[in-house]
């Protein structure tokens, strides 16, 4: 009798394991995690001066402030006229990564964490200052964003976090009143959370390249922060990775909300991300050694 009961129990267990409904209930928390592709809406091919375009930030719905990652020149590019309408030399040649407009000022960061402030950038004689932060070359700062409600800048780390952790990519806050950096991270993008978006029975074709990196013990090979921006409508933080062409979206309190993949060959080397005031999302791409750089308006809706 005991032997028969054991057979019935094992059979029931096997049926439960093979029951698709049982599998579904066990993975309900993953079923709503799906990587969505963002396709391009408009593409703006850029002149030779911006072949190595890095960061972008919008003055208005037409004019984009931009930098090139090798020279200390600030470019103002008009999307409607398809031309550079102004140039401003702010520093010598260096490795400049991102910029952001904050009120009447523009801030630019280099990879070693040197922050430039261009005060009253619209004036004929803007004042330029620089601030050395706690970051160094090994941190490889590539993202810079502005949170107006908190009056602070955000720095996105591509390389080493300040606490040397490898399981996440951190964002740090710089207070614009005190002009001081908080060395404790403001946000953390957990890399295993990114990985969880690619688990399941069906793996999208564009994620296969990404999944090859998951076997690496160093999880930083999964996602490299190349730019960050703040959605002016939702206050969400958008983190761009040129590695695997991904965008991770964090809620204002730092929770991973969404992962997007960039679709199309025009995303040669995505290095900049920005919203226009009306909530349109744009990506800037270096030329990748072929052709011209570009700015792409994405088919994205808040």
Q: Model-predicted segments: where are they?
A:
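C-terminal motif of bacterial Sec signal peptides marking the signal peptidase cleavage site
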Residues: 13-16
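Sequence/structural signature of beta-propeller domains
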Residues: 18-302
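Sec-dependent signal peptide recognition
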Residues: 2-9
């Amino acid at each position: 009798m005991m032997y028969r009961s054991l057979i019935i129990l094992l059979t029931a267990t096997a049926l439960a394991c093979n029951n698709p409904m049982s599998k579904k209930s066990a993975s309900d928390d993953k079923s709503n995690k799906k990587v969505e592709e963002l396709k391009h809406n408009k593409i703006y091919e850029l002149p030779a001066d911006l072949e190595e375009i890095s960061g972008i930030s919008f003055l208005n719905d037409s004019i984009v402030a931009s930098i090139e990652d090798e020279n200390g020149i600030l470019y103002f590019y008009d999307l409607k006229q398809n031309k550079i309408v102004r140039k401003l030399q702010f520093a010598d040649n260096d490795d400049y990564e991102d910029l952001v407009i904050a009120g009447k000022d523009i801030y630019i960061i280099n990879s070693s964490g040197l922050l430039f402030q261009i005060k009253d950038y619209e004036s004929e004689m803007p004042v330029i200052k620089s601030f050395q932060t706690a970051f160094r070359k090994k941190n490889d700062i590539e993202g810079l964003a502005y949170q107006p409600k908190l009056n602070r800048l955000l720095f996105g780390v591509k390389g080493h976090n300040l606490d040397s952790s490898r399981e996440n990519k951190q964002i740090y806050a710089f207070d614009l009143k005190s002009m001081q950096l908080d060395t404790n991270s403001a946000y953390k993008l957990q890399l295993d959370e990114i990985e969880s978006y690619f688990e399941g029975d069906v793996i999208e074709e564009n994620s296969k390249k990404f999944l090859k990196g998951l076997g690496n013990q160093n999880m930083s090979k999964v996602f490299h922060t190349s730019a960050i921006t703040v959605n002016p409508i939702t206050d969400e933080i958008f983190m761009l990775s040129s590695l695997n062409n991904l965008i991770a979206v964090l809620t204002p309190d730092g929770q991973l909300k969404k992962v997007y993949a960039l679709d199309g060959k025009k995303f040669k080397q995505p290095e900049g991300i920005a919203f226009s005031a009306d909530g349109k999302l744009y990506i800037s791409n270096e030329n990748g050694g072929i052709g011209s750089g570009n700015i792409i308006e994405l088919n994205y809706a808040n």
